[in-house]
């Protein structure tokens, strides 16, 4: 590079982290400038298509300026990127481990992520133009150029990244973030576009008349929905079914499935169901505005949202069940997480309905104390409609999933009480309840003192503490109920799960099923050491009592490091310390 040649040792020493960061930052800058210049030149080239209006916008002088700017950016950025990228690639060729450096993987991942998103959005705009008739006069030259440049940039770096592989832990983590961000984005884009597409079709049905919509059904909004559905679906399919198909052990995959897809679709579905129930109940109570068929316009988005959310939820729930049986060591964990997530969401819906119900009862008490002039006719309709909608959505779900949780306790009480999912669920509810109680008490005491010191009226005091009272009345028994459950779990040793022992099991390979049962009882994994025939198989110890006895003896040992020997009809627990 500087008139001489580097040996492999010299290259390794030269590429320190500081130097590596500098080189990749310069490459990123050069690539951005070069891509911008290429986009400008391609946009001008598209403007030469006969009939394209962009060819005359700004006049000849403007086009010459764009040509000069594009060429200068392309030459400068290309030279900058080419020089430093050539040096980096030379280092990679001489030193293979360099291809797995965290800085390099971060660079490749960021470019792939940015190029993919920019390219897909540009492709959606071009697709809208095609669906709108592909008029040469309205050709989006800039967006077409952006799509081409972003696609070339993405493919080059994606192909390079996949060719080099992802052997290091940082590389796998970065690749996981990249895959699941784009997979999630594609799923959300496709689902939202499909929902709006169905909404457009529903509100254009003839029985609505002209009270809701006007104009043709084939409009730019519908074309945009189709474009988003197509490219969102393609993005989701590529990253979920191709890129993530073998990534079953990744923690990011579990976050994606449980937090984004299952929880997200459940929340969206509950919102849609609650809205439908609320609107229908409100209509039954009467006094709605607008009246007639126009009132049911909400079905245009609520029903599609409910159906799409249900489909997404059902697909990923089935996926969780399939992976649970495909990977038995994660069977209990996967199903357990799903049950507790749904229980938490349904409880939140139920509590919201109860809080509103308590507010209605307090309002009735307030009406009895207030003059009739301060109360509007039919004030209760909206509140009672929302309350009933939340309760109709929350009660069945809560009863179903809470019974599922109680049933799981009867199957494997120790492991269930010690599970992280249960601990997070219980303490999340307890924390929310305690915070709510504290806020309520602060406001009530403040309002009482303020009323006393400022000689305010009783009506003013009532209005100031009403919201705190209605949440306090619901939160207090909720906190008490779940605090009792937590204390009960603690008496069964649930908090011991936070102090996992290092357990090494020496056992014959034929007794693998026994090891799985021991792990289930302990609530965590063990280190398996398979013998080569010296110890007879311990098949006779597979009974529930024997497994519970082994797990209890391991937990009762004071040492955090335990060796477990299992053979034939006996076992031996040996505490040890590493020298």
What are these language model-derived features?
Residues 1-12:
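N-terminal amphipathic/basic-hydrophobic helices that include classical n-h-c signal peptides
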Residues 10-510, 514-578:
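Hydrophobic/aromatic interaction determinants used to assemble and anchor large protein complexes
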